[in-house]
């Protein structure tokens, strides 16, 4: 009787309904009374304010010295162009900053698809209109794309370089979060005779750089990592200056075979020199889908198994691989 009273219900049913290519509805039930709002509000705040992503942070437009200029032969003024550039959905693989170029001869629309990118950079909304050229003229610009988290105004990125920055390098407030809209609601749920339970409904829309399901997984992982410190309260830990190498989660040092993947998925990973779980979580979905013979079904299997262990694809690890693995090799 005592154990039944102290035991908390955990969600048994997780239903994901795709409402579009970048929108999904996720339903979790049952939850103990009150836990719907507790978890829903925590996930909502993380998804809207703390998710990592990429955004345009600086622009140089040929012939433009400040944002209050007008460009001859271009319908939009510079401020409108900058606002449109904020909506470019870009993904960078393996780098934190890149400079891209855009050059278009008019007349006609200038879209995000006209941006020239490297092989490790993707534009997810190439149809986005940046400007409209109304005459036989050209529009050229250079875009600095950076990786960050949440929302970052220009003032928060202030550095010593600002005083010597050349005229014409226009700074943008950046919204790095890939989540465009999120709403959650809590409905009633029932398990046998209990009718006082919660059902959490998340309606999430992204900018296309990440799947809605993956966004929720990453937000849950962030929340889990932040709460983990409360599990073992030992007070303030003393610094260990003699320890040169950061501690690595032992789970990441285990071979991918421990994930008990299907033979097909395991062989595909090994063919790409992915031997440890730490190697795997640093790969992105796009990178894995480029692996020969590894399809979306195998990718879904990998993501689900990682999520069950509180992990996800696209994570970044410092000092990987650790010295212990290098020595073994």
Swiss-Prot record:
Gene3D superfamilies with a match to the protein in the record: 5' to 3' exonuclease, C-terminal subdomain, DNA-directed RNA polymerase, insert domain, RNA polymerase, RBP11-like subunit
GO MF: DNA binding; DNA-directed RNA polymerase activity; protein dimerization activity
The keyword Nucleotidyltransferase appears for this protein: yes
SUPFAM superfamilies in the record: C-terminal domain of RNA polymerase alpha subunit, Insert subdomain of RNA polymerase alpha subunit, RBP11-like subunits of RNA polymerase
Matching SMART domains: RPOLD
Protein name as annotated: DNA-directed RNA polymerase subunit alpha
Gene: rpoA
Alpha C-terminal domain (alpha-CTD): annotated span: 248-329
């Amino acid at each position: 009787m005592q154990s039944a009273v102290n035991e908390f219900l955990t969600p048994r049913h997780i239903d994901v309904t795709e409402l579009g290519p970048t929108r999904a509805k996720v339903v979790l039930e049952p939850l103990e009374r009150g836990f719907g709002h507790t978890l829903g509000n925590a996930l909502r705040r993380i998804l809207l304010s703390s998710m990592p992503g990429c955004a345009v942070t600086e622009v140089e437009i040929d012939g433009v010295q400040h944002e209050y200029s007008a460009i001859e032969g271009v319908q939009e003024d510079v401020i409108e162009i900058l606002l449109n550039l904020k909506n470019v959905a870009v993904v960078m693989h393996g780098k934190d900053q890149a400079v891209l170029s855009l050059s278009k001869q008019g007349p006609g629309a200038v879209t995000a698809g006209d941006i020239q990118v490297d092989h490790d950079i993707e534009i997810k909304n190439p149809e986005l209109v940046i400007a409209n050229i109304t005459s036989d003229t050209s529009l050229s610009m250079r875009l600095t794309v950076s990786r960050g988290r949440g929302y970052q105004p220009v003032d928060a990125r202030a550095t010593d370089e600002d005083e010597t920055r050349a005229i014409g390098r226009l700074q943008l407030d950046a919204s790095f979060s890939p989540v465009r809209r999120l709403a959650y609601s809590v409905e009633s749920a029932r398990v046998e005779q209990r009718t006082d339970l919660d059902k959490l409904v998340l309606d999430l829309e992204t900018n296309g750089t990440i799947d809605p399901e993956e966004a929720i997984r990453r937000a849950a992982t962030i929340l889990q990592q932040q709460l983990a410190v409360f599990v073992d309260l030992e007070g303030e830990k003393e610094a260990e200056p003699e320890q040169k190498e950061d501690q690595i989660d032992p789970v990441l040092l285990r071979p991918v075979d421990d994930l008990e993947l299907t033979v097909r998925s395991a062989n595909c990973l090994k063919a790409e020199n992915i031997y440890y779980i730490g190697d795997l979580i640093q790969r992105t979905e796009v990178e894995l889908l480029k692996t020969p013979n590894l399809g979306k079904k195998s990718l879904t299997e990998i993501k689900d198994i990682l999520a069950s262990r509180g992990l996800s694809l696209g994570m970044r690890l410092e000092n990987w691989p650790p010295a212990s693995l290098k020595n073994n090799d």
